[in-house]
Curated annotation (Swiss-Prot):
Binds RAB27A that has been activated by GTP-binding via its N-terminus. Binds MYO5A, MYO7A and F-actin. Interacts with PRKAR2A. Interacts with components of the exocyst complex, including EXOC3 and EXOC4. Residues 4-124 form the RabBD domain. Residues 495-856 are annotated as: Actin-binding. Residues 232-248 are annotated as: Negative regulation of PRKAR2A-binding. Residues 551-574, 613-625, 784-793, 826-840 have a biased composition (Polar residues). Residues 252-294, 351-578, 592-625, 778-806, 826-856 are annotated as: Disordered. Residues 193-209 are annotated as: PRKAR2A-binding. It comes from Mus musculus (Mouse). This is Rab effector MyRIP. GO terms for molecular function: actin binding; myosin binding; protein kinase A binding; small GTPase binding; zinc ion binding.
Length: 856
């Protein structure tokens, strides 16, 4: 696979011997490919059979997956394959000593196929080098044969194919290879090379994206590249061709500056277009007069050229000639344009189709070459052999994709300040600048059909784009506040808004990002409507030129059409382009607004705050504001969910306490309750600590359950988004994560049940939990003596914040002591007081009224 292969020095016998070797190599390759294809087919059938049989669990446990023979003790023992993980018999597998595992026969064949097919070689080397080995030798010999036989006469260029010793399939990273190829080849060969290189680049991008299987964004990128592979290939090939053509034109201009040929002047006032298409022998192709592309292809007419020639009869200075060369450099052409100088016109010969012209010389007649699409049989045979279309079918044609939106939007954008200060040019000035009146007239068919690939500095481009302005004029915004709004974003080819800093949105949910951008744009517009309407009556000095621009758009359309773009400075051009991008962004946002619902409009209108919104906010600050709003919404939702879960757990706990206390009765109000005293033998501090610890455990358990539920929901969403090509190992990892999360949820539920059992044990032991006192916030002595019931503590719990963070949960759970309770602490005292004490305790247990039993 060397860079060069020169076989020009071989004799006929040596060439014949090389051809025999190449033919034998091709035959061997074909046989090997047939054998590998049969092996692949057998493996595919075996895999399909295994996929069907593996669904039956009993068959997998009792029979061999390969030969379907049943397993028997000591006679036909089963063994587990190390690759496919299926159970196979002894006859269907072999032991690999270096790997220390059993491998079935099918997996061995798969390994052999991967080794013999050289997949790594074809994926990494052959995709980059299309022609190497025998194919490269054969191509070189064929080129040599064509050179010797003389059958390689270039139909299009009029020269011979020069032998290209470079590897045409190499993409070493430089475009010099393609430039060298295009010098000695026809444009058809150059286009074929560009298409092949573009296809290889797209395939390499797809393979790189597919290598990152764990990233959802890379998978989406790979699918997009596969779906739009043909369009992207054509676009990239066009870019490569433009670079090749630009370099060829630069070389031609340099040669023209060095030679500076003198062309005879035409003193006649009119030149008739004639269809004298003559042919010349091959020996005349070195004539000094070369063909030039017609003026109609660049929106020039013969009348305009003659007018400009008669107006400027004196020869131009070298500075004007250099300026003309710079203007011509921006025009797409397959041939040099040095001879199309308006001051030095010669008698012309026009082709029958009107697309190509040549200079007429009295002594020598130049050969006529029509560079439109040829119809000869040789050219068509070359097209079929190279499996590509002609370069002239697509290059230089008017299409919807080539339409320059920035130039078309100049009709909708106000002119620059420097343009307003210039007086309106007279028709004579417009003609002297090299642009005739027919070049900008909408009724001129030549101007309407001009090339869409000319530079933005040419006023003929504006005339060519007028036919496409109707759609953009219908979509133009009618709100002046919207027209004045400064937007900091830019647009790519697909009308995707991007930040000014160059950061692209790479989120996995493009619809959500689009809705966020739409809502933000609507808030900006509504916030700026009020201030701008108030400032409209008293315009500031800074806003006066902008309003003046808006008022004079309709009056200055003709002025901008005939003005010369080269007279404006760089700064004015940059400002116009920035305004065009902003206007195009406004159009895209207005089109997307029509698809939103009225409910979202009302919601965004109610939340709009004009005093906080400013037109000079950068895109980064706006993105930060949107992220903060999303965080607040998410925190509010999570706080609501946490509060709901905590209240459910607390209410369930209180319900268990109420049920364990027995049927409710309305006991008489005791004097101790009226005085705010606890029953005899009740340790107030101890009961409060116990209830506080129980509530903390409830909060921790509820927070753990909520966090685990969130993890489960995230795992479920990730499982739904998994691509169909996800491997078995990734699925197994996800299943392990789900099982671990489920185990944690089960553990949290066990903790909750343990807390409930402890509460019931406390109730059965005789502890009166209802008349406890909250000791969390004691600010004065009066609050300490107040008795709080379950009803009042429930109201306080509703005001509690969200449970602590995960670190605090772990610390609290590790520090929480284990409470031990004495069942006989009420039996302290004399034996005579025991019945009385037990009776009083029973009454205290029945004291909570019926209102606290209602669970809500």
């Amino acid at each position: 696979m060397g860079r060069k292969l020169d076989l020009s020095g071989l004799t006929d016998d040596e060439t014949e011997h090389v051809l025999q070797v190449v033919q034998r190599d091709f035959n061997l390759r074909k046989k090997e490919e047939d054998r590998l294809s049969e092996m692949k087919q057998r493996l595919a059938e075996e895999n399909s059979k295994c996929s069907i049989l593996s669904k039956h669990q009993k068959f997998v446990e009792r029979c061999c997956m390969r030969c379907c023979s049943p397993f028997t003790f000591l006679v036909n023992a089963r063994r587990r394959c190390g690759e496919c993980k299926f159970s196979v018999c002894k006859s269907c597998c072999s032991y690999q000593k270096h790997e220390k595992l059993w491998v079935c026969c099918v997996c061995q064949q798969a390994r052999l196929l991967r080794t013999q097919s050289l997949e790594w070689f074809y994926n990494n080397v052959k995709s980059r080098f299309k022609r190497f080995g025998s194919a490269k030798v054969l191509k070189n010999l064929y080129r040599k044969h064509r050179l010797e036989s003389g059958a390689c006469f270039d139909i299009l260029g009029g020269g011979l194919f020069e032998p290209n010793l470079e590897n045409e399939g190499s993409i070493s990273g430089s475009d010099s290879t393609f430039y060298r190829q295009s010098e000695g080849h026809s444009m058809m060969d150059t286009l074929a090379v560009a298409l092949r290189v573009a296809e290889e680049a797209i395939e390499e991008a797809i393979s790189k994206a597919e290598s990152h299987g764990d990233s959802l964004d890379k998978q989406n990128e790979a699918s997009y590249l596969r779906d739009h592979k043909q369009e992207l290939t054509e676009e990239l090939a066009g870019t490569i061709l433009q670079r090749i053509i630009r370099k060829q034109k630069d070389k031609a201009e340099l040669r023209a500056e060095e030679e500076e040929p003198e062309w005879p002047r035409s003193q006649s006032g009119s030149v008739k277009a004639r269809g004298e298409g003559t042919t010349a022998p091959p020996g005349r192709h070195k004539a000094r007069a070369t063909f030039r592309r017609s003026q109609s292809a660049f929106s020039f007419t013969m009348e305009d050229a003659l007018k400009s020639g008669s107006a400027e009869a004196a020869p131009r200075s070298p500075k004007d000639r250099a300026q003309r060369l710079l203007e011509e450099a921006a025009l797409p052409s397959w041939r040099s344009m040095d001879g199309l100088d308006g001051t030095n016109l010669a008698p012309l010969l026009q082709s029958p189709d009107g697309n190509w012209m040549t200079l007429k010389d009295g002594s020598r007649q130049p050969p006529t070459r029509l560079l439109t699409k040829p119809k000869s049989g040789t050219f068509q045979a070359l097209e079929v052999a190279s499996s590509v279309t002609s370069a002239y079918d697509e290059i230089g044609s008017d299409s919807e994709e080539d339409f320059d939106y920035s130039e078309a939007l100049s009709k909708l954008c106000p002119p620059s300040q420097s343009r307003l200060k210039q007086p309106q040019p007279q028709p004579t000035q417009a003609q002297s600048s090299g642009q005739g009146p027919l070049a900008t007239s909408p009724s001129n068919p030549e101007a309407m059909c001009s090339d869409s690939e000319t530079s933005s500095t040419s006023s003929s481009r504006e005339a060519g784009c007028r036919a496409k302005l109707s759609w953009l004029q219908r979509k133009a915004p009618k709100n002046p506040a919207v027209e004045k709004m400064p937007l900091q974003g830019e647009l790519d080819v697909n009308f995707n808004p991007q930040a000014a800093g160059g950061e692209t949105s790479d989120s996995s949910d493009p619809e959500e990002t689009l809705r966020t951008a739409e809502r933000r744009a609507r808030r900006w517009r509504r916030a700026r409507v009020g201030p701008e309407e108030s400032n409209r009556g008293l315009p500031s000095p800074g806003a006066h030129p902008r309003a003046l621009h808006t008022a004079q758009v309709s009056d200055n359309v003709s002025e901008t059409d005939i003005s010369n773009e080269t007279q404006n400075s760089r700064s004015s051009t940059d400002s116009v382009e920035e305004k065009l991008r902003n206007r195009l962004y406004e159009l895209a946002m207005k089109m997307s607004e029509k698809e939103t619902s009225s409910g979202e409009d009302q919601e965004s209108e109610s939340k709009a705050e004009p005093k906080n919104q400013k037109g000079s906010l950068s895109s980064e600050e706006n993105n930060q504001g949107v992220q903060e709003e999303l965080k607040k919404k998410c925190s509010a939702v999570s706080l609501c969910n946490i509060s709901t879960e905590v209240l459910k757990v607390i209410n369930a706990t209180e319900e268990l306490i109420a049920e364990s206390a027995g049927p409710w009765e309305i006991p008489p109000v005791s004097t101790d309750r009226e005085n705010g005293m606890f029953p005899l033998g009740t340790d107030q501090v101890r009961l409060d600590k116990q209830l506080t610890s129980l509530e903390e455990n409830v909060y921790l358990a509820a927070g753990t359950v909520y966090g685990l539920e969130g993890q489960l929901s995230e795992l479920e969403d990730a499982a739904r988004c998994i691509h169909s090509s996800t491997g078995e190992t990734e699925l197994a990892d996800l299943e392990d994560q789900v099982a671990a999360a489920a185990a944690q949820v089960h553990h949290a539920e066990l903790q909750i049940s343990d807390i409930e059992s402890r509460i019931s044990a406390l109730t059965i032991a005789g502890l009166n939990i209802a008349p406890c006192v909250r000791l969390t916030r004691r600010r004065d002595q009066k609050q300490r003596s107040q008795v709080q019931t379950i009803d009042t503590s429930r109201q306080q719990r509703r005001k509690l914040p969200a449970p602590p963070v995960k670190a605090e949960k772990i610390e609290a759970s590790s520090v929480t002591p284990i409470k031990t309770f004495n069942r006989n602490f009420l039996l302290q005292g004399s034996s005579t007081n025991r019945p009385t004490a037990s009776t009083g305790d029973t009454k205290d247990l029945m004291e909570p009224d019926l209102e606290s039993a209602v669970m809500y």
